[in-house]
Design a protein with these regions (language model features):
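Positively charged, small/polar-rich N-terminal and surface patches that mediate targeting and assembly
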Residues: 2-104
Length: 104
């Protein structure tokens, strides 16, 4: 049970967005803050984590944004917003264990 009446006890899907570093360097505090700011414009609750991804056999510093939401359209909107912000060609999206590449 929760004290927040807007939260469904059944839960909601958790979506993960994966944003790889374009130049292979670690994400700067400024870049991370910009991702936080843009994400907070669309969602009130989320988690941003640093991760190490792998692309074509090479390690890639990756930001992972996790959001619980039933609004898939808004999640895809966030993928496009963050993709443009970070100059990506694609952003990875995982929903309920299924991975998709979102072209920007």
């Amino acid at each position: 049970m929760t004290d927040n009446p807007s939260v469904d006890d059944v839960g909601m899907p958790v979506h993960g967005l994966f944003i790889g570093s374009r130049n292979g360097d670690a994400w700067s505090a400024e870049e991370r803050d910009a991702v936080f700011t843009e994400t907070s414009r669309l969602f009130k609750s989320f988690t941003i984590m640093d991760a190490l991804g792998c692309y074509m056999g090479r390690p890639v510093p990756t930001l992972m944004v996790r959001v619980g939401s039933n609004d898939v359209h808004r999640i895809r909107e966030l993928a496009h917003v963050l993709g443009r912000l970070t100059k990506q060609k694609e952003v990875g999206l995982e929903t309920m264990g299924r991975f998709h590449s979102i072209r920007i």
